[in-house]
Amino acid sequence: MTPQQLYDTFREQYGEYVVPAICGVDKACRLNKRCSVVQSYPVIDFDGVKDCYYRGCCPTPASVDAVCVGGKRKYFCFVELKGWKSYLEHIDKQKRSVNETINKYNLSGKLFASKKLCEKITGLTDLFDNLPLVFILVTDIDINVSPMASFTNMLQSLAQTSTSKHSECVNESKKC
């Protein structure tokens, strides 16, 4: 299956969750109608797809916020929106540590659960074996105000959630 075919599968089965712009997935932007620019290629509200798929079934796992195709439709993209600006501005005042916030964000868990949901919907357990995949993290950091410091803090926080391919493979192979 190609990235475009996977995207089309979601558009056909969950068309009501197609949004014309990524900010249509963000609650704050949607409520305040901040985004009036329509993208050339819409995204799919993956939280909506997940909620629909698991409705009345069982506990709903975490998921990424949206999916789309990118890179001239060569890549299937998982998109996560994170509001880091407020967190970074008040980091000294907050009682939660960076680690607690990272655990709350659970980026690797969301990506894993989202991939599993794609496999369930398509019925293909080997879906991502050869499918070009991209994880996109969209933030609200202003590039005009201390962009390097903000970016550094964000990368340090993300690095703590990352795993090496080796440890990921070892953990997955133990499950078999």
Task: Please tell me what each predicted stretch does.
Residues 66-68, 75-86, 114:
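Conserved catalytic cores of phosphodiester-cleaving nucleases, focusing on short active-site segments
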Residues 70-73, 128-130:
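Flexible, charged surface loops at secondary-structure boundaries
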Residues 1-61:
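Basic, amphipathic N-terminal segments that precede the first structured/catalytic domain
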Residues 84-143:
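Catalytic cores of nucleic-acid endonucleases
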Residues 51-70, 78, 90-91:
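Acidic (Asp/Glu-rich) sequence patches and key acidic residues
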Residues 129, 133-176:
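Short, low-complexity, polybasic intrinsically disordered segments
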